[in-house]
Amino acid sequence: MIPYRLCRKSDYPISSYPNFIKEDGDMDNEIIIDKGCGLDVHKETVVACVMGSGIKKEIRTFSTKTNDLLRLKTWLSGLGITHIAMESTGPYWKPVFNVLEDGFTLILANARHIKNVPGRKTDVKDSEWICRLLRSGLLSASFVPPQGIRELRDLTRYRRKLTQALSAEKNRIQKVLEDANVKISSVLSDTFGVSGSQMIEAIMEGKLSESEIADLAKGKLKSKKGEIREALVGYFQDHHRFMIRASLEHIKHLEKQIEDLDRETKKKLAQYQKEYELLQTIPGVKEQGAAAIIAEIGVDMDIFPSEGHLSSWAGMSPGNNESAGKKKAERRPTAIRI
């Protein structure tokens, strides 16, 4: 993808928008991009509007199947289109972006920014309006990292989901133990540590007495054998055994998936090894944290004009929406979770 640095929201503040738009909703003659295309992306279709010097305004509809997207790409290339803009509509923009990113300057615009620009007439199609805003330089490009970073982001985000699922299964087991009145979680600091895991397996097999299971305690837990023995006395039924067995099998599956993801993540990080190691010199940032940081913000900090822009994009900078002493409510972006 050609790097996009031409049209930034900061270059054209809201106060200057009326200079580009007439009262009837049409743009005036101040054009920044000569030949552009606006895309209105849906789940099944993409509506494309092309405008520019030497080009008659035309609107065509394509399906989102790969072959049709390739025909869209060929059509735009033949017209000499240089810039393409689209809204960030759920996951639907991604396959379109992937097909078109080679050879064009792509602008993924926030739908709220497009909506907030004044002057739109009701009969103007979405794709045409996006194209007009694009050519007048009124669109702010969202940060879309390179393909390698996007793939790394998929891995780290999926790992976080699996880790959450793993924690949920462990909590589920503890609830089942509580339901059976087995209180080992109140004695063991880590129910799923070495000692705790062996005790749970022994409970599942049902062959050992409470005293024999308590003897599985290791390290400092040996001094708590009496407490453990008392905590193991409960009302454990076959139903509890079935529920815990199902959760344990799921835990093993999740742990295997996480191991596979970690191996694939290390492969993706090989080209960013210098940045990966540098991030780990920050106190509190370890391997997973460093991988997540690279996956979310990339390694090219030129994308962000300042540290303030980066913190704002990450959802970690509070807004300052106040006028005449009154604060205006506005939906804030969700902070990135590392």
Task: Indicate where each model-derived feature is located.
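A detector of single, family-specific signature residues
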Residues: 1-338
